[in-house]
Regions:
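Membrane-interface transmembrane helices that cradle and orient dolichyl/undecaprenyl
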Residues: 201-202, 242-260, 294, 401
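Short periplasmic/luminal acceptor-recognition loop of GT-C membrane glycosyltransferases, typified by
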Residues: 508-555, 585-593, 638
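Membrane-embedded, hydrophobic transmembrane alpha-helices
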Residues: 1-97, 420, 574-575
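Signature aromatic-anchored transmembrane alpha helix within multi-pass, membrane-resident enzymes
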Residues: 106-113, 207, 259-265, 279-286, ...
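Membrane-proximal, lumen/periplasm-facing interface regions of secretory-pathway glyco-
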Residues: 131-137, 466-523, 541-542
Length: 662
């Protein structure tokens, strides 16, 4: 509960800071929206403050606490405003609950929503288990904190990308640990749901608010990321607030709404690269709206300038950082156009082309049928979206009766969807348009009340079935985490016994130990010197390197070029390069006795043929090095000193002899 309390306190400080900033710029968002705008804006500013601290080598607990204290003092004058907004929001929720309760199907919907939220909330207290979170969203901040500095990590391919969410992870990991970072990201999801409910309720009543939230929770990929320390919740929250601002502007023509749209489009772009798609879609819709309103060219230019100025203020620093570090403002994407340090065509093929060959090919026919395929054949897009894409189809028959706001939501979603289809095609990256499509879905269900009650109830039943299926999915994901939540065992036992993963025995197909690297990494830490530096070598298999407590680089042939395997020809080349990098030890999951597996991409794909001599030279070099750990789990720790191989008995990492300690 200490972690949760810390997140709540920091959230309150962020909201106070956001309220102060909104008042300084004389921006007053409408109604309940002010609370969500302030909360999100405060966290966005926190991310920048952590970035500045890190760039100047100031990532220390005392520095972060000092920054939080100064932000609290800056916003303390807004305590009354915060209390007023919180009371208004609680009253609104109570009124909404009373309004919804008498309707049976809505009551069932409400119960299912509450159960999904409860199960996910409990799961968020467990140690993090998601591979993407451990090896990216937490691993990069952990390396930053080891040196107290934010620097370019050339073997971490996303370390130069926009990193607002990971800055917030760094803040909490510095003070308390990764669970507090996970809880912070989880609460961004709650803020997203509350903001979606409030926004929809203000226009279509409490029933509309509940239906919109239910539509979002029908997204199967949502429950997979809701309780993980990833950036999906934050970027979607920023995107929703940017859309909210655009809708407010369409009704008021206030320049302050355009400023807010620019701020949150910039924050979305500063959280994840696909936030640029959110910004492009918003500004495209803005131009269309101004043309429909017959604005003069001078007024169009002025309005665009306001939005773009605030967008640039909050987005540009991340892309400038990427350009200065790598030579590519959107590193490592669009290598053919921008190039990029420590990147090459082989890596670009592996990361951005090979993986997408299994996606749905780009064609007009596939574009038309893709909403149906996302729902029914989600494996093409790595996840299913739920029913909201199909639930909006009846809106085609109501087009003449659609409100201006619904049309704007539809235009925004359509433009972003087109960008997504041509450049991304991963269902997880549709998150920014799921709230708008959920609002459209809620609107259509409510409008069908007088036109086709049968169709309305069919849509309601579809949503209930979607919620029920996602509740089962959520239970499957979260229940295995509960031992880590309720402390029925140690962290070591939790990671040893955790089984809900994609790691399966190739013979039996059964789930196997999810995190053997945990014990291996703990034992490796006992054997290393304070000035040791690791290189992690692996081929095609997943390797959870987050658990290492020592500085490391990734010597992954198909994921980085700091150790350029295409230029290595023999043992001497390999040893020389590792000495240049200061590497003292190698951790690997490759069995030298078996060599390179015949199924490895290095062997089977001709694009990787230039890497093969270097990989063989690397493995040859390891055969003449000392083995410190040979674990039954298939992991090895080599020391790059001397040339005599030490034969150790086959042991599990937890049983490695303590005599090997230095």
């Amino acid at each position: 509960m200490i972690s949760f309390s810390l997140v709540i306190v920091c959230g309150a400080v962020a909201t106070l800071l956001g309220l102060r900033l909104l008042s300084l710029f004389r921006i007053s968002p409408e109604g309940e929206g002010r609370l969500f705008y302030a909360y999100a804006l405060g966290w966005g500013v926190f991310a920048y403050l952590v970035l500045v601290l890190g760039l100047f080598g100031g990532l220390y607990p005392v520095s972060v606490i000092l920054i939080l204290t100064l932000c609290f003092l800056l916003g303390i004058g807004k305590l009354k405003t915060l209390g007023k907004d919180l009371r208004a929001f609680v009253i609104s929720l109570r009124e909404g609950a009373r309004e919804v309760l008498p309707v049976p199907l809505l009551l069932v919907t409400k119960i299912l929503v509450a159960l999904i939220l409860l199960v996910s909330f409990v799961g968020a207290f467990a140690p993090p288990t998601n591979m993407d979170a451990l090896n990216y969203h937490l691993a990069v901040p952990k390396l930053y904190l080891q040196t107290h500095t934010i620097i370019f990590l050339p073997t971490m391919l996303y370390s130069a990308t926009p990193f607002a969410s990971e800055m917030i992870n760094s803040l909490f990991m510095l003070i308390k640990g990764e669970v507090s970072a996970q809880l912070a990201q989880h609460l961004f999801g709650w803020a997203l749901l509350f903001a979606l409910f409030s926004f929809t309720k203000s226009r279509y009543g409490s029933r509309g608010g509940l239906l919109a939230v239910a539509g979002l929770l029908c997204l199967s990929s949502f429950v997979f990321v809701f309780s993980e320390p990833k950036n999906d919740m934050l970027v979607t929250l920023f995107s929703l607030l940017a859309v909210w601002s655009l809708l407010s502007w369409s009704n008021s023509d206030r320049q302050s709404d355009l400023a807010l749209m620019g701020v949150f489009a910039g924050l979305a772009s500063g959280t994840k690269l696909f936030g640029l798609g959110v910004a492009f879609s918003l500004f495209a819709v803005l131009v269309v709206l101004m043309l429909l309103k017959r604005y003069r060219l001078s007024k169009i230019s002025m309005s665009l300038s306001v939005g773009l100025a605030f967008f640039s203020l909050f987005a540009f620093p991340w892309y400038l950082k990427s350009y200065l570090w790598s030579g590519n403002p959107v590193y490592p994407f669009f290598y053919g156009l921008f190039g990029g340090n420590h990147w090459n065509g082989i890596l670009d093929y592996r990361v951005f082309q090979l993986g997408r060959e299994s996606y749905l090919p780009v064609s007009f026919v596939n574009l038309i049928i893709s909403p149906w395929l996302i729902v029914n054949r989600g494996e093409i897009f790595l996840a299913r979206t739920g029913v909201v894409f199909l639930a909006i189809l009846p809106g085609v028959f109501l087009f003449k009766r659609l409100s201006q706001e619904i049309k704007i939501l539809g235009w925004f979603s359509l433009i972003y969807y087109l960008l997504w289809f041509f450049f991304l095609r991963d269902a997880r990256y549709l998150m920014p348009i799921i709230p708008p499509t959920a609002i459209i879905c809620a609107f259509i269900i409510l409008r069908l009340e007088a036109r086709s009650k049968l169709l309305k109830w069919l849509l309601m039943l579809t949503i209930i079935l979607g919620l029920g299926a996602n509740l089962l999915t959520d239970l499957k994901v979260q229940l295995p985490k509960f031992p880590g939540v309720f402390g029925t065992g140690s962290e070591e036992e939790f990671y040893r016994d955790f089984r809900e993963t994609e790691r399966r025995d190739h013979t039996s197909g059964k789930l196997v130990e999810a995190f053997p690297e945990y014990e291996f990494s703990r034992k490796a830490s006992e054997l290393l010197f304070p000035d040791s530096k690791l290189a992690v070598f692996s081929l095609d298999q997943a390797f959870y390197y987050y658990f290492f407590d020592y500085p490391y680089i990734l010597a992954l042939p198909m994921r980085q070029s700091l150790v350029d395997f295409a230029s290595l020809r023999n043992d001497e080349d390999v040893s020389k390069r590792l000495r240049e990098l200061g590497i003292t030890h190698i951790a690997t999951d490759v069995d030298l006795g078996g060599g390179i597996p015949d199924s490895s991409l290095v062997v089977t794909d001709s694009h990787f043929a230039p890497l093969l001599p270097g990989v063989n030279a690397f493995l040859s070099m390891l055969k003449n090095r000392s083995i410190l750990i040979h674990a039954e789990d298939g992991f090895y720790l080599y020391e790059l000193v001397g040339s005599v191989q030490i034969e150790l008995p086959l042991v599990r990492t937890r049983d490695c002899p303590s005599a090997l300690r230095r």
